[in-house]
Every structure is written in structure tokens, then in C-alpha cells.
Regions:
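Membrane-interface amphipathic segments in extracytoplasmic regions
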Residues: 1-187
Length: 187
């Protein structure tokens, strides 16, 4: 998940859709004020998901309020749903009198559900996150709502909290990833 103040975009990372690769590419364009909620690398960019790495905006709050209540609520993480990103950004938006979420370009990638499940199956199998279940057993668990997806099917990550509206400006189909990213980068 990335929030770029320099380029005014929010990349909402979904599961098994090249999210880490997209983050790795975008990383080179980020500044110290941008949020990069991915803990694989820390080269001075805000990779721990802190909204305010240089404390430039914390002066809007008294020190106790910021340290005790606000900073804990402003952490971001890699596969954070859009509604929660919006909710956390709204805390600063009110103080800045500028709606960050609504004024930034928001994009995400989704994938054919079957391909996504196949990718997840092999990722879990190769990562030792699952026992010796066969793919057929996984499909049966999906049918019976017993497969632990952790939000794997992704579309709900792009919706508001009531699951009524999509909060992204643009959704890229994984099958058209290159064309979709070109469209985003030319925006």
C-alpha cells in the first residue's frame, strides 16, 4: 500500500495481484513524506506504515493527543482495505481542510478469482503455510466456506465500510496489468 503526496496517488494493495512488484517499482519515485506500508526494505522511506515520518503534520495536535491517541490510529499496513485508509486519512484531512483520500488518484489490481485461488494455493504450499491438502480439497473448502481466505477475493477491500460503493478511481484487471499500469502512470 502506498500513499504518494508528491504524485497524489494511493495504491491499494490486494492479494496475489503483483502488489509487491508494483510497490517495488513505485518505491524509486517516493519521497520521505510518502507512506510505503511494506516492511521488506527501509532506505529512509516510510516503510513501517507511519503516516507522518518527519512529524511535519503532528504539530496540528498537542503532543499528548498525538502520541497517545492519534499516532496509533494512523498506522497503515500492506493489504489495508480502502475504507480504513480513508478513515485514517480523514483524521488529517479535517485538520488540513483538504480531503486527501477524495483528491488523490486511487488504483488497485484485481484478478480472476480462479487464477487468484491457484496462485494462493501454490504460494501457501511453497511457503509451508498449509498442510498437505490437495487443490481439490481447497476447492471443496471454498465451496463450504471453510477455506481461510483472509480477504483473498479482494473486491471487498476496495469498497466502503457498508460494502455499497467502490472507493477506487481505477481498477486494473491483472490479465491487463501492463496496459492498466501504463494508463495509471500516464495519468
Amino acid at each position: 500500500m502506498i500513499i504518494s503526496f508528491k504524485y497524489k496517488f494511493i495504491f491499494i494493495k490486494t492479494y496475489k495481484t503483483a502488489g509487491s512488484s508494483i510497490e517495488s517499482y513505485l518505491y524509486q519515485f517516493l519521497s520521505a513524506n510518502d507512506v510505503y506500508a511494506h516492511t521488506a526494505d527501509n532506505n529512509g522511506i516510510n516503510c513501517w506504515g507511519e503516516f507522518d515520518p518527519e512529524n511535519k503534520l503532528s504539530n496540528f495536535f498537542d503532543k499528548d493527543t498525538y502520541n497517545e491517541r492519534i499516532s496509533k490510529k494512523l498506522r497503515f499496513y500492506a493489504h489495508m482495505p480502502a475504507w480504513l485508509i480513508k478513515d485514517r486519512l480523514d483524521i488529517y484531512s479535517k485538520r488540513l481542510k483538504f480531503d486527501i483520500f477524495d483528491n488523490f488518484y486511487k488504483f488497485a489490481v484485481i484478478r480472476n478469482p480462479f487464477d487468484l485461488i491457484v496462485s494462493d494455493y501454490f504460494w501457501r504450499k511453497n511457503s509451508n503455510f498449509m498442510n498437505e491438502k490437495s487443490f481439490d480439497e481447497i476447492i471443496q473448502e471454498l465451496k463450504n466456506n471453510k477455506y481461510q481466505t483472509h480477504g483473498l477475493l479482494n473486491l471487498n477491500k476496495l469498497m466502503d465500510i457498508k460494502q455499497e460503493n467502490i472507493l477506487c478511481d481505477y481498477i486494473i484487471k491483472y490479465e491487463n496489468l501492463n496496459e492498466g499500469l501504463l494508463k495509471v502512470f500516464n495519468k
